[in-house]
Amino acid sequence: MTRSLKKNPFVANNLLKKINKLNTKAEKEIIITWSRASTIIPIMVGHTIAIHNGKEHLPIYITDRMVGHKLGEFAPTLNFRGHAKSDNRSRR
């Protein structure tokens, strides 16, 4: 179910403060965050945000096509290594 339109999109307060501080100083630096549930809003465009995937922080450059999506969509948490190899020689 989607979020109600009468509510604003969720953005973590500490992440919003960091974005606003960088926008006022007009600086570009990597912002580290654990908030995967935060929605990307237009003031984030052009920044690089390092999103935690459970093991490390992955730096993601925010573009205008990402607006409206969640940060966690761009940092995959699972690493699929493929199905088990069917080795018939070891069964003999």
From Swiss-Prot:
UniProt source species: Lactuca sativa (Garden lettuce)
Gene Ontology BP terms: translation
GO molecular function: rRNA binding; structural constituent of ribosome
Entry function: Protein S19 forms a complex with S13 that binds strongly to the 16S ribosomal RNA.
Subcellular compartments: Plastid, Chloroplast
Membership in a protein family: Belongs to the universal ribosomal protein uS19 family.
SUPFAM superfamilies to which the protein is assigned, alphabetical: Ribosomal protein S19
Keyword Methyltransferase: no
NCBIfam families attached to this UniProt entry: rpsS_bact
One term under GO cellular component: small ribosomal subunit
Gene behind this protein: rps19
One Pfam family of this chain: Ribosomal_S19
Lineage: Eukaryota, Viridiplantae, Streptophyta, Embryophyta, Tracheophyta
Claim: Membrane is one of the keywords in the record: no
Record-given protein name: Small ribosomal subunit protein uS19c
Keywords, ordered alphabetically: Chloroplast, Plastid, Ribonucleoprotein, Ribosomal protein, RNA-binding, rRNA-binding
UniProt-listed HAMAP family: Ribosomal_uS19
